[in-house]
Design a protein with these regions (language model features):
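A short, conserved acidic/glycine-rich loop-to-beta-strand motif
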Residues: 1-3
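C-terminal, non-catalytic tails of nucleotide-sugar-dependent glycosyltransferases
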Residues: 29, 34, 69-72, 87-189
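Conserved nucleotide-sugar donor-binding catalytic segment
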Residues: 5-104
Length: 194
């Protein structure tokens, strides 16, 4: 189901569920779930060697691989209350994401090969959504003459290329009414003096 988070974050988190290809880009289901025991036994249950996180995601991939036409549905109502804290396993495992992903990819290589386009497009969709979200926040901060973070200033000085970063930087810079941005302009913005 959807989750109501409390603690540090008070929000409604809406996982999407989906078919095997949807789960290759990200975990689309919370760890709290209902399934038939036969399904658990057929896929072998949780991989107990996964102690650092993502074991539920890996389990869902294993489960869906045993049922290629399978689909994990999500109840579209927040039936789960989920406590959030800076040191919770959900937060700390994200710091290890790039270390944990190779294990998942290698273990489920056939699925990744069969659905490579879906996997890449799913990751790209998340990346683009985050980039647009950050860009919107940058534009809001500039219009409100708020101080920019050092990370945002560094990005504007050296935008990424090939992932939409340069395009975002150009759109952000277009708000600047004094011609092309220069490093001095960014330094002034870090002091909230646009």
């Amino acid at each position: 189901s959807w989750m109501h988070t409390f603690g540090v974050l008070d929000a409604i988190v809406c996982p999407s569920g989906g078919s095997p290809s949807a789960f290759l880009a990200r975990n689309c289901c919370p760890a709290t779930h209902i399934l038939r025991r036969a399904v658990w036994e057929q896929c072998g249950g949780y991989d107990e060697s996964m102690r650092s996180g993502f074991e539920d995601w890996e389990f869902f991939l294993s489960m869906l691989e045993t049922m290629p036409e399978g689909y994990i549905g999500i109840v579209e109502s927040p039936l789960i209350d989920y406590r959030t804290a800076p040191a919770s396993s959900n937060v700390t495992s994200m710091a290890k994401r790039l270390e944990l992903m190779p294990f998942i990819i290698e273990k489920h290589m056939t699925s990744y090969q069969n659905y490579v386009m879906d996997a890449i497009l799913g990751i790209e969709a998340s990346s683009v959504a985050r980039l647009y979200g950050w860009e919107s926040e940058m534009m809001h901060a500039i219009k409100a003459e708020q101080e920019l973070s050092q990370e945002s200033i560094a990005f504007m000085e050296h935008p990424t290329y090939g992932d939409g970063g340069m395009a975002a930087a150009v759109r952000i810079a277009s708000l600047h009414d004094r011609g092309p941005w220069k490093k001095d302009d960014l330094e002034q913005m870090s002091n909230a003096e646009i």
